[in-house]
Amino acid sequence: MMHHLIQEITKEQLRTDLPDFRPGDTVRVHVKVVEGNRERIQVFEGVVIKRRGAGISENVHGPQSVLWRPALSAHSRVHTPKIAKLEVIRRGKVRRAKLYYLRELRGKAARIKENTNAAQ
């Protein structure tokens, strides 16, 4: 009984405005940052390294920031209200669910083939 109640409560809190994305996809994440009494939006762009969990506790590791610092990678909850917008820039064609090997690669070696068969 209690398990069903928890599922119903968390189902209401899931975000439906997020696009479908997978590890290997290049995404642009718009994050709300609060500094004092001001709120601004900071944009991160990079490759998703992994997704973990399900439902309200689903995490995404990445994106590995291409814009600011090559070695920066972040993880956050997918359904958090701190994510203002999430855009899929490019679909990647990979054979793994966890792309940890991308952490050591730089430049052209870190490229991922584009999946042209993916539904847009």
Curated annotation (Swiss-Prot):
The organism's superkingdom is given as Bacteria
One example GO MF annotation: structural constituent of ribosome
Spell out the Pfam families in the cross-references: Ribosomal_L19
Q: PROSITE patterns attached here?
A: RIBOSOMAL_L19
Going by the UniProt record, its keywords in alphabetical order are:
Ribonucleoprotein, Ribosomal protein
* Alphabetical list of InterPro entries matching this protein: Ribosomal_bL19, Ribosomal_bL19_CS, Ribosomal_bL19_sf, Translation_prot_SH3-like_sf
Q: Mind telling me which GO cellular component terms the entry cites? A: cytosolic large ribosomal subunit
Q: Does the keyword Ribonucleoprotein apply?
A: yes
Instruction: Name the chain's protein.
Output: Large ribosomal subunit protein bL19
Q: Which organism is it from?
A: Geobacillus kaustophilus (strain HTA426)
